[in-house]
């Protein structure tokens, strides 16, 4: 329940708090995004959306309007707003067949237990920079401290 097609050239994707925040840092630096969808049952197919995107964080002015597009989810971290420039399909014959056994609920349960203060602290500690040290601006900080290995 985290992807919305707004029109033929725009999608928005709600992203939840997790251990890394690579996409936010790299979209901020290069603004390019690719979303890939694979058919794991039925006819083989891969669909890719190519375009430009921006990360909308909880502290950004556009957050309130964009977040209303989704059902509230514990741990909501940012929304990626993507302008689609190109849609491409490919055969998908190399994609294995999988049967979905169900959704995992652990991330939602974890975020619920953490609560908003705990999530904010977690994002400050774990999501301020990408693995390669790029800033994510997750909590509105202009210059995050670079973590030493």
Residue ranges: model-predicted function:
Residues 1-149:
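Binding-site signature for planar aromatic cofactors or substrates
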């Amino acid at each position: 329940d985290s992807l919305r097609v707004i029109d033929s050239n725009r999608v928005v994707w709600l992203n939840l708090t997790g251990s890394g925040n690579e996409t936010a840092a790299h979209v901020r630096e290069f603004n390019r995004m690719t979303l890939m969808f694979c058919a794991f049952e039925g006819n083989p197919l891969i669909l890719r959306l190519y375009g430009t995107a921006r990360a909308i964080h909880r502290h950004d002015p556009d957050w309130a309007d964009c977040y209303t597009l989704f059902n509230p989810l514990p741990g909501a971290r940012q929304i990626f707003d993507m302008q689609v420039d190109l849609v491409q399909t490919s055969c998908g014959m190399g994609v294995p067949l999988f049967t979905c056994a169900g959704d995992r609920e652990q991330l939602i349960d974890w975020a619920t237990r953490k609560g908003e203060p705990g999530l904010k602290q977690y994002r400050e500690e774990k999501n301020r920079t990408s693995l390669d040290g790029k800033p994510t601006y997750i909590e509105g900080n202009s210059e995050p401290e670079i973590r030493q290995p």
